[in-house]
Design a protein with these regions (language model features):
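Acidic, Mg2+-coordinating catalytic module of metal-dependent nucleases/exonucleases
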Residues: 176-198, 205-246, 431-498
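N-terminal accessory regions of nucleic-acid-interacting proteins
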Residues: 28-30, 249-305
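Structural signature for extended repeat/solenoid scaffolds and their inter-repeat hinge/linker regions
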Residues: 281-358
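Generic beta-strand/beta-sheet core signal
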Residues: 275, 311, 374-377
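Metal-dependent nuclease catalytic cores that hydrolyze phosphodiester bonds in DNA/RNA
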Residues: 1-124
Length: 498
């Protein structure tokens, strides 16, 4: 590479070998899912930039100058260095707001770059503000934090609000790096704008400086290690062949799951097979032989009922659940809203789903029949059922909690983990082919569904197609859940014993 290489805060989180690959292979661009994530983040930035003030309002002293500098995007290292110079020039001019700011420098002898979405002039210096697509704070009557409305950044003072900040390592590293690169203009504070684009939550950032510097100074691995996120990484096409060449144990036990074996000197799949370490060695051998799922010894028991409903939910980020799908073995029903979540539309939709589900249960009981509703990995459904009851008045929280705790709400994944072992996990998409089920849209996952939800709300031909895809995907998840539990109920035929 002819251009100077710079370390970013994102390089310090997750896979550290990615940094080496990014330096050696700049020609490899992001994956489609990576491009989708970037597009979603850019859309979030644009919403924030549109909300930022461009002049003083009545009561701000409108005769006083208000300077906002909007810098163009930068991608290459050379462009980033140029934006750094423009950012610092705008700071010397005393600009009140600088969007798409870039700060470059050297920390611990390492060249770094930090892209800050907004720099805000304060009485003490400049406040870095970052934009993300995760939730950075949650309402909490027992907690207090400070916030500046997005439309008042550069003009208003912080307000105390009842909310509890949510820490994300990458956010802390971005703000900590900015704190050091700002030098004398740093204030010790930073702000984050998350899914609520109207609020910039303030926090003290100096506490993130030591861990950020430790991460920056940590040695970069010489070889790859398989992690959970590898499947969606642009460099997996390079790392997977090398891992197979090394026969690295992380191919079977990814991330920290292989540390115990490494500590014992077992670093390869074959080494684990030869060590005859019980279940782990059997799993390694099965992986080598291309066997995705094994069955544990003993009888398989899965709760069954006279009336059975398979449920799957789709949520938009951390903002709300817009789709509750239900399959009764013959008919799929979609309780869906394409309007904004978090308000009346989501409440009405959840209430309709809940009353329908409870109505089916009550009718079964009245007919002297047993009832059960099933889902695969109930964490998401449980969260949004309880959250919906807490946020809205239509359904009692106690009623939801009682249902979740009852034998009539069954997490199929819990039974899968009891009876099966996967050589590459036990996700629904892993088990589908094993039990003979295929998705019509097998390229859709949780991340893609976020992009589809955005498209679905835009209307037109593309919006209609996105809606159809989301409903089809949700229906297939419901049907796959039923297929998995019926496979278990049949004794998991054809699976080799562990």
């Amino acid at each position: 590479m002819n251009e100077p290489f710079q370390v970013r805060p994102a390089d310090l989180v997750g896979c550290r070998f990615r940094l080496r690959q990014r330096w050696a292979h700049p020609e490899i661009g992001p994956t489609p899912s990576g491009e989708s994530r970037q597009a979603q983040l850019e859309a979030a930035r644009e919403l924030v930039f549109a909300a930022l003030p461009t002049k003083r309002a009545v009561g701000d002293g409108r005769r006083k100058a208000f300077v906002r500098v909007d810098l163009p995007p930068a991608t290459t290292p050379t462009e980033l260095l140029s934006r750094d110079a423009e950012t610092r020039a705008a700071m010397r001019r005393g600009a009140h707001l600088i969007t798409r700011a870039v700060l470059c420098g050297t920390l611990e002898g390492i060249r770094v770059v930090d892209e800050i979405d907004v720099l805000v002039r304060t009485d003490d210096g400049y406040l870095p503000v970052i934009v993300s697509n995760h939730r950075v704070a949650r309402k909490d009557p027992e907690s207090s934090t400070r916030m500046v409305p997005t439309g008042r950044l550069g003009l208003g003072k912080p307000l105390a609000v009842r909310a509890k900040p949510r820490h994300h390592t990458i956010d802390g590293y971005r703000l900590a790096m900015a704190e050091l690169l700002l030098g004398d203009s740093a204030t010790g504070l930073g702000a984050s704008i998350g899914q609520d684009r109207e609020r910039a939550y303030l926090g003290e950032v100096t506490r993130f400086v030591p861990p950020m510097l430790r991460a920056l100074g940590a040695p970069i691995p010489d070889e790859p290690l398989r992690l959970k996120q590898c499947a969606g990484c642009r460099f997996w096409q390079l790392c997977e062949p090398r891992l197979r060449e090394l026969d690295d144990i992380s191919l079977v036990f990814s991330g920290g799951r292989g540390d115990a074996w490494r500590d014992r000197g077992i670093v390869t799949v074959q080494g684990l097979i030869d060590a005859s370490c019980g279940e782990a060695s059997v799993i390694a051998r099965s992986w080598r032989e291309g066997i995705p799922v094994l069955r544990r010894q003993g009888p398989i028991r899965v709760p069954r009922a006279d009336v059975e409903i398979d449920v799957d939910m789709e949520a938009y980020l951390d903002q709300g659940a817009y789709l509750w799908g239900a399959y009764d073995g013959a008919v799929y029903r979609a309780f869906v809203t394409w309007d904004d979540v978090g308000g009346e539309a989501e409440e009405r939709n959840f209430t309709q789903f809940w009353r329908w589900l409870m109505g089916v249960r009550d009718a079964a009981h009245a007919a002297g029949k047993t009832f059960a509703a099933y889902c695969y990995a109930a964490g998401g459904e449980n969260h949004w059922m309880k959250s919906s009851a807490k946020r809205f008045d239509s359904v009692e929280l106690a009623e939801v909690q009682a249902f979740i705790a009852s034998d009539e709400w069954v997490d199929v994944f819990a039974h899968v983990r009891t009876h099966l072992v996967g050589t590459d996990g036990l996700g629904l998409k892993v088990l589908g082919p094993v039990v003979g089920f295929t998705w019509e849209d097998d390229d859709v996952d949780g991340e893609v569904s976020v992009a589809l939800r955005r498209a679905a709300r835009e209307g037109g031909v593309d919006g209609a197609a996105a809606r159809e895809t989301l409903l089809r995907y949700n229906e297939d998840d419901c049907r796959a859940t039923r297929a998995v539990r019926e496979f278990l109920d049949a004794g998991a035929p054809g699976l080799p014993l562990l």
